[in-house]
Amino acid sequence: ERTSVFFDEEIYEIEKKMVVNAQKSIKIATYTYSKSPLTDLLEKRKSEGINVKVAGGKNRDGHVPQFDMVVTTQKNGIYHPKFMVFDSKDVIISSSNISSERSASNSAVLFRDVPVAAAILESEIDAVFSNKFERRCETGCETETGTIIFNPGKGCVLIKNEFLKAEKSIKAGVYTVTSKNPVITGLKTAIKKGVDAKLIFDNWKGDDGKIVNKKAFNYLSSKGAGVKFDEPEQKNESLFHHKFAVIDGVTTVFGSMNWTSSGCYRNREIIVINKDPQIAQKFEKYFDSINQ
């Protein structure tokens, strides 16, 4: 298949397969990095002559890999995109980091033979290695994968616009949500006009011991959304780390961005707006399976 969607444990398996099969190059963006079986495999491929580059936002364990890696910092926000490019043509865009924590619940989309998208993503990695924080696709770049947006940019406004187009349903799974940003504004307006919105948030707690998403949970519930918290103890996972929304069973929004002000305005993020109903149906089927 040219396009495939993966969830949870499936993601590591496809990442491993793509790394093993790469012929020339592997370029990766991630927020957190730590030593893991996947990074061991990347080191092996580097020793075999494959060009391996990783741009990360945070090295969690201090491990220095035997491939090219840059840990980058920004004046505002964090470096948070999550994607892989293989041989300048195949792309995985994910909610998953390159870290030893594999038990988190995530989603990823593999696009094969997408050179336009691959070139855009590779230029992002190359810019980070050159210590250049370039504005890229801030209002959206049309590619074989759909519309790619890098924030800081217009990503949240574009998601809002997609929500405003909704006629029947919005189904979303998101790790972190705050109650004031364009995405939430669009969602609130869609609900007001009768769109059925079902949402699942992670129930992680901040340093104060309070559930971070509780305020957004209460706000959206009061507006008529069907909101629930994920229950990780039932699925042996550490956190619900998704960042996706399915609109009318046709349009899918996915990538690295949480629905927060930081995600909208400060962090480096990748967002994809895709109109392939087959992708939407796979995300929707997954959502329905966990929204019991």
Report each predicted region and the residues it spans.
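Short, basic, glycine/proline-bearing loop/turn elements
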Residues: 26-28, 66, 170-172
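N-terminal carbohydrate-binding/catalytic regions of secreted carbohydrate-active enzymes
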Residues: 24-25, 29-38
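Active-site beta-loop-alpha junctions enriched in small/polar residues
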Residues: 31, 175, 202-204
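Secondary-structure "cap/kink" motif recognition
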Residues: 11, 16-25, 158-169
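N-terminal "mature head" segments of proteins
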Residues: 2-6, 22-25
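PLD/PLD-like phosphodiesterase catalytic module centered on the HKD motif
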Residues: 1-5, 11-12, 35-146, 152, ...
